[in-house]
Amino acid sequence: MIIWIASYPKSGNTWMRALLSTYLYLENDKFDFKLLSKIPNFTRDKYFENIADLNLLKSEPLKISEYWNAAQSRINLQGEEKIFKTHSACVSLKDKWFTTETHTSGYIHIVRDPRSVVCSLAAHSNTTIEKSVKDLLNDNFIGSNGKYNLAELTCSWKINYLSWKKKKKFPGILIKYEDLFDNTEKEFKKTLVFLQDKLNFELNDKKINQAIKLCNFSELSNQEDKRGFVEQVNGKFFRKGKKDSWKEELSTNLKNQIEKSLKKEMQELGYLN
């Protein structure tokens, strides 16, 4: 069965993957980005090989919805719990759901202040913040579809957030990036408690502290500078690691646009009073 780490892009998904892969799979005392391959992106080409025509899925990205079920069924043939990353909203397209309780045993849903998301996403994609805001509010936004990944039906930040929040057919937890930033140990332990029965491991404070130390932002940023990072696109992936970076980068007009469009959800999450 699949356990998802689900989020809108640039919300802390990779940081959580780093923490979890270090805790679960580290064999020495040094973090390596290769560990992240233990928690892969679901839309990697290899999970759809021999199921679909990959060239067709590259040219007609929304057709991937026809193969979500088959790809997840094949993954689950291994008969073990497996963690996957996704930026897909948990929605249906032409009556094809991204995932169901047949394939999924749970999810870790990570959210981040959308004002910070657009700043980080613009730098990561080497585009303007205006373009990132447009994408953030686009209900039909399609992400990824790169060299090694197929398309992800990311949708707007609002749809992405609500789609996982409202999914009641399998258990999940919500982790706010800002809480993970402020109290990494507490939020990481919350995540491990959620996972421990599914993955059959014991909590180990020494390993928790080691994972937090090896995966703090400065360490990950230094690793990226020294060795590079395969998920780096245009700009630096681990850029600032701040909680409220939007206060330094976002114009008043764009700030107001986001807050007006997402007022209810941002208030619900404590991003607006």
Regions picked out by a protein language model, each given a short descriptive name:
Residues M1-I175, Q232, K240-D244, E248-N273:
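PAPS-dependent sulfotransferase catalytic domain
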Residues G12-L26, L174-F201, A211:
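PAPS/PAP-binding and catalytic site of the sulfotransferase fold
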Residues K85, K189, L195, E202, ...:
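Compositionally biased, low-structure terminal segments
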Residues L93-D95, T184-E187, E219:
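Short, solvent-exposed polar/charged micro-motifs at secondary-structure junctions
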